[in-house]
Amino acid sequence: MVRLLDANVLITAHNLYYPINRVPEFWEWLVHMGNTNRLKIPVEILEEITEKSPIGQWLKEADNAASLRLDEDADLGLVQTVIAAYAADLNDTEFIEIGRDPFLIAYAMANRAERTIVTVEASKPKTQRANRRISDVCNDLRINWCDSFQMLSVLNFTTSWRSALDGNGHD
């Protein structure tokens, strides 16, 4: 199972729980999970992260961005299907509001059985149009999703994660 991360997962982790300079183990773990194809971030989502932000700077270090980048192109037909799940007649302002989220969802839709979206957006099923949350669009399209803490639990993150690796450096 590959978990596709929304940018807000990294932003919230850095701002609230695991600052890059205080909990480097978390950020090293993300790279490791990217290298083992358990966590990936579509290029459209990586592009949402500003280069001058702490996360943007971290992504530029070593091979961090390359380790996490999902190496495939979006299916534009699926992107259109996702956009229609927000509303069939979004205006230009609404397109700007939803940002790159339809790409994230489309990548998961391309392989529903093997992909789960990770987002910090809480479900709000009554919201409409561009205000819809990733989780609610995923529910409508039958795409798996979870929040950051569910991901951390399923993937068994601890700050001592390296000690769980076997003698060959593989988990």
Give the label of every model feature segment.
Residues V2, S123-D171:
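Acidic, PIN/NYN-like endoribonuclease modules and their adjacent C-terminal/linker elements
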Residues R115-I117, N144-W145:
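Hydrophobic beta-strand scaffold residues
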Residues R3, A7-R115, S123-K124, Q128:
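Active-site-proximal, substrate-binding regions of enzyme catalytic domains
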